Regions:
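Membrane-helix interface linkers and caps
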Residues: 1-40, 55-57, 220-243
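Transmembrane helix-loop-helix hairpins at the membrane interface
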Residues: 78-270, 274-281
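Juxtamembrane helix-loop-helix connectors linking adjacent transmembrane helices
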Residues: 19-89, 103-106, 270-282
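Alpha-helical membrane-inserting segments
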Residues: 5, 9-13, 42-57, 144-148, ...
Length: 282
């Protein structure tokens, strides 16, 4: 539904605005790899924040918040997941949230365009689990687009990120039979039962541990890269005075409607019982 209804509407509205693409500047394969590591670091940091928030919300309301992405990825055919998450989504989302949005807002300042692109990208995911990392990742991809003018760079990075998050991680979770592990733990199994389970799926656990080590490595490396290159992460101001940027870009009717709609979707996703209660009283 997101791609069949919301995206065409968003494209139709945004394309009516005049835009100008950033100047093109090619990057080397080495720079692409460094950018990818930094993207992974942002994704994993954001994912930790999102998980923490949803865990707190779940504890307060007495039930876990559903992870929409993981539910979809683990419950879908892997070929369908690959085509949708790794091929289609990065192309469409980068075209809309980087090409269309940034081209039409960069005149207000590169910082404004980057934050707006990240905010809209984060909200568009429609759930709190993904908002934090999608917001951070969206801003960094917008920064790269502003500096390179190359959409193929951000599409390539987006594809790599989705491949790791929606394909590799899901395959590894299936390889270790996570549901069986949770069942073993919840049944109060002793250490021998846990060891028997892990030996049963030893190849999967080896792959999973390698993946965890990879996450830790890119997380630390990415943070170091951000520290090293922090002085290069500069954005040029735009035509609007500093005090008027928020009102001009965020405080307009279209953006207010967009934010209200997606915040409502996030709340509904976190508290589906509210919808059930309302519809049950109708």
């Amino acid at each position: 539904p997101l791609y069949l209804v919301d995206m065409p509407v968003l494209v139709a509205v945004v394309k009516r605005m005049p835009g100008e693409a950033p100047a093109k500047k090619s990057i080397t394969p080495g720079q692409f790899v460094l950018a990818l590591i930094m993207c992974f670091a942002l994704m994993y940091c954001g994912n930790l924040v999102g998980t923490l928030i949803t865990t707190v919300v779940g504890a307060l309301k007495g039930s876990a918040v559903d992870n929409a992405l993981m539910t979809y990825a683990t419950g879908s055919n892997m070929i369908v997941t690959f085509l949708y998450m790794v091929i289609c989504a990065p192309i469409l989302e980068e075209y809309i949230f980087r090409k269309l949005i940034v081209d039409r807002t960069v005149k207000y300042g590169q910082g404004v365009a980057v934050v707006l692109s990240g905010l809209m990208f984060g909200l568009f995911h429609g759930n709190l689990n993904q908002f934090a990392y999608a917001f951070l990742l969206g801003m960094f991809l917008a920064f790269l687009y502003v500096k390179t003018g190359e959409l193929k760079v951000t599409i390539g990075l987006h594809m790599c990120i989705n491949f790791m998050g929606a394909v590799v991680s899901v395959l590894l979770l299936k390889a270790i039979h996570l549901e069986e592990y949770q069942e073993v733990i919840m049944n109060g199994a002793d250490s021998q039962a846990v060891m028997d389970y892990m030996m049963k799926y030893l190849p999967g656990w080896i792959g999973y541990m390698i993946y965890v080590l990879f996450i830790l490595a890119v997380l630390v490396t990415g943070i170091v890269l951000f520290i090293v290159y922090r002085k290069k992460l500069k954005l040029e101001p735009g035509q609007i005075a500093k005090g008027r940027r928020f009102k001009t870009v965020i405080g307009n009717p279209g953006m207010i409607c967009y934010c209200v709609f997606w915040i409502a979707m996030i709340i509904i996703q976190m508290f589906p019982e509210i919808v059930t209660a309302i519809t049950g009283n109708l």
